[in-house]
């Protein structure tokens, strides 16, 4: 066991360094509003040698993909908490909206860039970004569909709702709210924003 301790410490340091590089890259990508940021700049801002970057990432596209994947993983964690929650459909919907808003607030500029990169097929890294965002969208659709069906069964939402159509409309509302919030220089408190969005959506779905 004693011989494994140094290896464990190395793993911690490696993970810390990798996260540090990704945090720096995400900030620079967001601040510049472009993925066209050199590995030299990222290394300098992160306080590491350029060669260190290539220990963790083969190239800039791989680094960008890792940044988006990290955003996806955190959003997926938020979604998983809602799925496993035993609360009412309305309470779970609010918790989902709140959690997603909180994740976007962690790096709004990078979220804006990711959305812009996805919509421009010629942009550097668009394929990697598009793939991760597609997975986020699919996860959201799955959870929203389950919430709508549960809400109808509980009598919280209208019985005649078409779940597929309702999910599309609700998803559009949430996506639009995220995009607007990510571009606001001084957004309202996240809990208040979640309440506003949830109230608006539930009035549309309500029985």
Where are these regions (language model features)?
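Hydrophobic alpha-helical connector segments
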Residues: 66, 80-109, 163, 167-170, ...
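C-terminal peripheral helix-coil segments that are non-catalytic and often amphipathic
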Residues: 1-4, 8, 99-102, 142, ...
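Basic, helix-initiating cap at the start of DNA-binding domains
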Residues: 1-32, 36-45, 61-65
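Amphipathic alpha-helical packing segments from all-alpha helical-bundle domains
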Residues: 73-76, 80, 125-154, 164-168
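Short hydrophobic/aromatic patch on the recognition helix
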Residues: 25, 46-57
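Base-recognition residues in the alpha-helical recognition helix of bacterial helix-turn-helix
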Residues: 30, 54-58, 70
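Amphipathic alpha-helical segments used for helix-helix packing
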Residues: 104-128
